[in-house]
Amino acid sequence: MSNLFQAFPGKTVEERKAIAKKFYRNFTDNFIEVIKLISASGSFVEKHFTGDFSIPNKVYDEGKRCQLMLSHNFNWEMACLGIPINSKHLFLIVYMPIGSKVIDRLFMKIRTRTGGALVPATDMRTGMLPYRNNLTMLGLVADQNPGHPKNAYWFNFFGKLTPFVKGAESGARRGNTPVIFCKFIKQKRGYYKIIFELGEQNPATTQPTDITKKYVEYLTTFIKEYPEMWLWSHRRWKWDWKPEYGEILN
């Protein structure tokens, strides 16, 4: 895989092949697990997706909303079901509508089976209105490609200049909403553990790009430790940097 060569030029061919083999196994498992989630009970999800929720629950106890910055980390679909079961917050899942209406409805059904709610990325302001009086945890897949490379923060990410969306940080700073990072660790086949880390308690006191920089560093560390757990096959590097897109931030 060309992405692995770019990200890990210091690894041998055999080492990259080993990562690719584990990645494809996880990719296949992810597909099978999504099918299972169509009918899985809450007790099944609770058994297969675990973690210490004390960090987000403390934010809830303080009477605050929070923002969760995730990544394309297996198995994010199980997280959509596991987080609402364990979190005191109402979990709002920001999602990109799928072109096929049939598939879109299927994934909407899966992702909301345990109490989470969906907010379309195409109209977040309207989508969040029904929940304005709730203490919510807003889940954002923050390593998503931006809609346009000009509207992004650019970082050197695994040997390639890479754009990151601005919205996750700007929304948190505007509302002074505590930011939490998280990752999913595969304990064994079909079993995952979520690990939280407080990214920023008071975003309004930070400078623009500070939170995104922390997130990029967090994501980089995670991928280096668990390279087989990240979705290498998605087109993360489809944009090439140009001077008019702005400065490189690391």
For each feature predicted by the language model, list its residue ranges.
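Catalytic core of membrane glycerolipid acyltransferases/transacylases, capturing the structured
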Residues: 62-122, 147-160
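Membrane-anchoring hydrophobic helices of lipid-metabolizing enzymes
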Residues: 1-70, 104-109, 115
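Generic secondary-structure boundary/loop-capping signal
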Residues: 34, 41, 46-47, 73, ...
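Non-catalytic C-terminal accessory region of glycerolipid acyltransferases
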Residues: 14-21, 58-61, 85-86, 122-250
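Short acidic/polar alpha-helix capping motifs at helix-coil junctions
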Residues: 19-20, 42-46, 71-74, 90-93, ...
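Surface-exposed charge patches
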Residues: 2, 81, 109, 170, ...
